């Protein structure tokens, strides 16, 4: 244990159910670090965009994150000193959908058709695009096809995943329903199919009366199911891991407490 005195520690999580989110809501995280004289600060609640972007690129010292795996993988590949300390896996709805008028009814029907994938501005990692690409690859593999068997059409999205001018109460993220641009392109006939996931994906599919081309979020093969949210990663910055491993241990204890609470309720 280091003698270095800390006054605050930063945390962040994706806006989906996670053990870290539950531990924060139950007060376990704040209680854990308060016992060490350390204040708990939320990265995504900060009014400072430079701090909020650490949710995606893990640039902030003395911080930890629990969420999708694409940002930490990208951050690590770019030389960020981030360390993996835990993995959770929660399966969710993943599907390729289309509209009735396209005539697409199965994965094999996707061959030669236009698959729309959103493309956001360069800068912060476009994890939405990575997620859709993996979803496409998984769906096509069910019928022995690859991404080369379809025409990938970029659907331009003006906003980055991080809105630097956003209201901090929205965590600096665009909280409008997802897939808006892709759905619009689908309705205009500019593309033939898209990937959706999670409860928002179910809502979108029902809203437009979509045809379910492939549903693989609960497939028996984990290589098919794996995507940005499966698994989710618990990461800490290198300084925290090396200088205060005792705090990392306390963090994991708090997360386990939240898990036990969830099992009991």
List where the protein language model places each region:
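Short, glycine-/small- and polar/acidic-enriched structural segments
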Residues: 4, 8-147, 152-156, 163
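Glycine-rich phosphate-binding "P-loop"
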Residues: 37-39, 168-171
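Pocket-lining segment of extracytoplasmic ligand-binding domains
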Residues: 70, 161, 169-265
């Amino acid at each position: 244990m280091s003698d270095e005195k800390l006054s605050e520690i930063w945390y962040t999580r994706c806006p989906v159910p996670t053990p870290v989110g539950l531990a924060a809501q139950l007060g376990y995280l704040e209680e854990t670090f308060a016992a060490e004289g350390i204040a708990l600060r939320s990265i995504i609640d900060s009014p400072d965009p430079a701090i909020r972007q650490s949710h995606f690129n893990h640039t902030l010292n003395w911080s930890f994150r629990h969420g999708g795996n694409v940002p930490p993988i990208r951050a690590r590949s770019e030389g960020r000193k981030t360390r993996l300390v835990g993995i959770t896996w929660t399966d969710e709805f993943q599907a390729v959908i289309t509209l009735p008028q396209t005539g697409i009814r199965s994965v094999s029907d996707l061959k030669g058709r236009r698959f729309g994938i959103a493309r956001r501005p360069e800068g912060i990692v476009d994890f939405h695009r990575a997620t859709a690409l993996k979803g496409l690859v998984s769906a096509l593999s069910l019928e022995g096809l690859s991404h080369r068997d379809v025409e990938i059409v970029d659907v331009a999205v003006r906003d980055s995943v991080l809105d630097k001018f956003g209201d901090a109460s929205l965590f600096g993220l665009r909280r409008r329903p997802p897939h808006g641009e892709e759905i619009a392109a689908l309705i205009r006939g500019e593309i033939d199919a898209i990937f959706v996931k999670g409860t928002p994906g179910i809502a979108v599919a029902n809203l437009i009366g979509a045809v379910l081309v492939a549903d693989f979020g609960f497939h028996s093969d984990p290589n098919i199911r794996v995507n940005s949210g499966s698994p989710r990663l618990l990461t800490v910055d290198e300084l925290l891991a090396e200088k205060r491993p005792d705090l990392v241990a306390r963090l994991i204890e708090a997360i386990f407490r939240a898990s036990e609470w969830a099992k009991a309720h």
